[in-house]
Amino acid sequence: MVLNIKAPENIVLKPTITVFGVGGAGSNAVNNMISANLQGANFVVANTDAQSLEHSLCTNKIQLGVSTTRGLGAGASPEVGALAAQESESEIRSYLENSNMVFITAGMGGGTGTGSAPVIARIAKELGILTVGVVTKPFHFEGGHRMKTADKGLIELQQFVDTLIVIPNQNLFRIANEQTTFADAFKMADDILHAGVRGVTDLMIMPGLINLDFADIKAVMSEMGKAMMGTGEASGEDRAIKAAESAISNPLLDHSSMCGARGVLINITGGSDMTLFEVDNAANRIREEVDNLDANIIFGSTFNPELKGIIRVSVVATGIDADKVPTYKPAIAETTNIVPEETYNEPIVQPTQIEEIPDFNSYSTENIEITDSPINQNFIGNEKELGLHANSFNKSEDDSPKPSFLGKIWGSLRASNNQTLERKNIVVNTLDQDNKESDIHDIPAFLRKKRD
């Protein structure tokens, strides 16, 4: 009897993380991560454009929809992109089967990324893989049609991913300047994906005092909806606080606030000189941003000898409540109910038939007495500026002048209590031709003034 005694195989069990680039934008993001020598992840690119695949640095390539597109691209049609991914479903599934977590990166608004990314996410979910979407939205100069296409693609993609991170390309103008090249600007957006993947892989493969396992990460990111990722590095005085603040204030993300987050993953990495107080300061600074007392906050700390003198803080906040996220609203988008000012219409002048015009020359002016009082010079010529109007004056039976033939045409005006006007008063005393009342004459209407 022969006994075969063998040493047990040393099987290393570790989670497999796959970064899946879809379309032109997704392929470029993967190229940037490969160039940065990102460790701990597998890379796959898929595209309908055969020429783009040839220039990819990734070794795992999928030509989507060979029969559907013949390698010529999706022609900016999401429907064609979806059909191409469905045609290549078996090949996509083979690259995803052994993965525990997948990052799907694509650009929304085109044909391949918008149409194929949701199909790939659906396949990943069917395989029980933790799925994270990291996608970009078009620039404003790309037009409204492309933006609407992107929004539809986001709605479709969100149905199949556990966590979704959206990076509007327009936000690149927040950090770019006149010397920033087009390639460098897109690399800034790709750095968000790079930092997110690195933050997860470092927690699982780097040595540290507080290590996290994949179950911890899954608890924070599974079925959490919209999320934000951020990373920050700092050195010198207060480096821990500065790195934490840089991580939680990413200008490229739409939802760059952690308000209302239901899950938070914190990774603090530094060299051998990182102190306990620095770790405490960085972690507490991030916790201050979370106003949800029931949030699941998972913390890890690792060492990296390459970061001597530097502290790096990576944050993944998931389940962000959109109602609590402060978003920028341009002034032109705000509407205000404007109550129109009250308008006053000029009184309609009804012409009065003049039966007889008196002969003014027949009246004597020898005993006319004229009394002047000061006039408010500010009033003259400024009736419109003062807001005075014919309807602003009130007329009463007691103090109104008696009607005359001119008064019937012009009306009699009396200033309101708030707009009292000192007028020039002309007091005319004449003898009454008919001797009806003492010795006062009957004065013409344009000279008549009621006596006090």
From Swiss-Prot:
Cytoplasm listed as a keyword: yes
UniProt cross-references to Gene3D superfamilies, sorted A to Z: Tubulin/FtsZ, C-terminal domain, Tubulin/FtsZ, GTPase domain
GO terms of molecular function: GTP binding; GTPase activity
Domain of life: Bacteria
This protein's GO CC annotations: cell division site; cytoplasm
Pfam family, one: FtsZ_C
Binding site for GTP: G24, A25, G26, S27, N28, G111, T112, G113, E142, R146, D190
Record keywords: Cell cycle, Cell division, Cytoplasm, GTP-binding, Nucleotide-binding, Septation
Protein purpose: Essential cell division protein that forms a contractile ring structure (Z ring) at the future cell division site. The regulation of the ring assembly controls the timing and the location of cell division. One of the functions of the FtsZ ring is to recruit other cell division proteins to the septum to produce a new cell wall between the dividing cells. Binds GTP and shows GTPase activity.
Subunit structure: Homodimer. Polymerizes to form a dynamic ring structure in a strictly GTP-dependent manner. Interacts directly with several other division proteins.
Protein name as annotated: Cell division protein FtsZ
Source species of the chain: Rickettsia felis (strain ATCC VR-1525 / URRWXCal2) (Rickettsia azadi)
Name of encoding gene: ftsZ
